[in-house]
Swiss-Prot record:
GO molecular function, one term: toxin activity
Comment, domains: The cysteine framework is VI/VII (C-C-CC-C-C). Displays a mini-granulin fold, a structure composed of two short, stacked beta-hairpins connected by two parallel disulfide bonds. This newly described fold is derived from the same cysteine connectivity as knottins (ICK fold). The name 'mini-granulin fold' comes from the structural homology with the N-terminal region of the human granulin.
Keywords carried by this UniProt record: Disulfide bond, Hydroxylation, Knottin, Neurotoxin, Secreted, Toxin
Originating organism: Conus quercinus
Subcellular location(s) per record: Secreted
Name by which UniProt lists this protein: Conotoxin QcVIA
Amino acid sequence: DQSCPWCGFTCCLPNYCQGLTCTVI
């Protein structure tokens, strides 16, 4: 999801990746 902040190849904390998608907390 482009609305989720990405840091390199991982989601920026405290968000987390679930497969190829990123979940925003």
